[in-house]
């Protein structure tokens, strides 16, 4: 494209910028990850994080997330969020709960309460926090805090889709609460080009542990 006329300089600059945006967007790929369990069946509630090897990607907190307590269970059982995201632990049961976590990623305690706590809990460090109830031992939930904007939680078919992944080399971390104790997840290398990418991951895990009946 040639632009000589001074009167068209602004229009040409705008068009060049727009084309640059389009070209930049076209270089971002969609990464699809299929997660299966030890038996080869689709594994829901698996967490996938992509971390760039060459650069620290900017990440922002999410809007307030709710983890509810109903029928003496946490819902959702696995929650994926980014660093700095506040979480409200709403109690919809007719009994009071005592919600806590002693995990290094986030230690907190919400003593016996009903309804909605006065303040949310801000998860300000990356990692996995196991949440329980000091009154009802069968209750358990997992809060996974990501320090990357490239993340996803597998659906009922074990599928994760991560959009806008720039070309480059990444560390892919896959985790599930059904992994053996003391397992920190599975880490592998992933190279992303300009084309969309599909990856399959099998974990030595079964479905997420279900809360036992009270």
PLM segments and residue spans:
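Bacterial N-terminal signal peptides that target proteins for export
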Residues: 2-15
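Bacterial N-terminal signal peptides
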Residues: 13-24
């Amino acid at each position: 494209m040639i632009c000589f006329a001074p009167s068209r300089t602004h229009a040409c600059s705008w068009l060049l910028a727009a084309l640059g945006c389009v070209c930049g967007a076209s270089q971002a790929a969609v990464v699809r990850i299929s997660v299966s369990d030890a038996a080869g069946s689709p594994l829901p509630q698996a967490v996938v994080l992509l971390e760039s090897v060459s650069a620290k990607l900017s990440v922002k907190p999410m809007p307030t997330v709710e983890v509810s307590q109903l029928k003496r269970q946490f819902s959702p059982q696995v929650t994926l969020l980014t660093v700095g995201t506040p979480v409200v632990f709403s109690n919809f049961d007719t009994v009071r709960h005592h919600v806590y976590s002693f995990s290094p990623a986030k230690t907190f305690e919400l003593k016996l309460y009903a309804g909605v706590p006065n303040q949310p809990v801000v998860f300000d460090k990356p990692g996995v926090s196991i949440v329980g109830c000091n009154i009802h031992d069968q209750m358990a939930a997992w809060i996974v805090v990501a320090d990357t904007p490239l993340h996803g939680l597998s659906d009922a078919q074990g599928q994760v889709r991560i959009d806008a992944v720039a070309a480059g080399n990444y560390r892919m971390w896959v985790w599930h609460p059904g992994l053996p104790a003391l397992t920190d997840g599975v880490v592998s290398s992933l190279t992303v080009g300009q084309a969309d990418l599909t990856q399959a991951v099998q974990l030595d895990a079964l479905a997420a542990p279900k809360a036992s009946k009270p």
